[in-house]
């Protein structure tokens, strides 16, 4: 699991 990628993906969805 790519945590950095996941965080970035979630941040992108939130913005």
From Swiss-Prot:
Known tissue expression: Expressed by the venom gland.
Annotated Gene Ontology cellular component terms: extracellular region; membrane; other organism cell membrane
GO molecular function, one term: toxin activity
Gene Ontology terms: biological process: defense response to bacterium; defense response to fungus; innate immune response; killing of cells of another organism
Principal location class: secreted
Assigned keywords, A-Z: Antibiotic, Antimicrobial, Fungicide, G-protein coupled receptor impairing toxin, Immunity, Innate immunity, Mast cell degranulation, Membrane, Secreted, Target cell membrane, Target membrane, Toxin, Transmembrane
Subcellular localization: Secreted; Target cell membrane
Family of the protein in this entry: Belongs to the MCD family. Eumenitin subfamily.
Its job: Linear cationic alpha-helical peptide with antimicrobial activities against both Gram-positive and Gram-negative strains and against the yeast C.albicans. Shows moderate mast cell degranulation and leishmanicidal activities. Has a very low hemolytic activity. Induces an ion channel-like incorporation in artificial lipid bilayers, forming pores with relativeley high conductances. Its mast cell degranulation activity may be related to the activation of G-protein coupled receptors in mast cells as well as interaction with other proteins located in cell endosomal membranes in the mast cells.
Protein name: Eumenitin-R
Protein source organism: Eumenes rubrofemoratus (Solitary wasp)
């Amino acid at each position: 699991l790519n945590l950095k990628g996941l965080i970035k993906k979630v941040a992108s969805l939130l913005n």
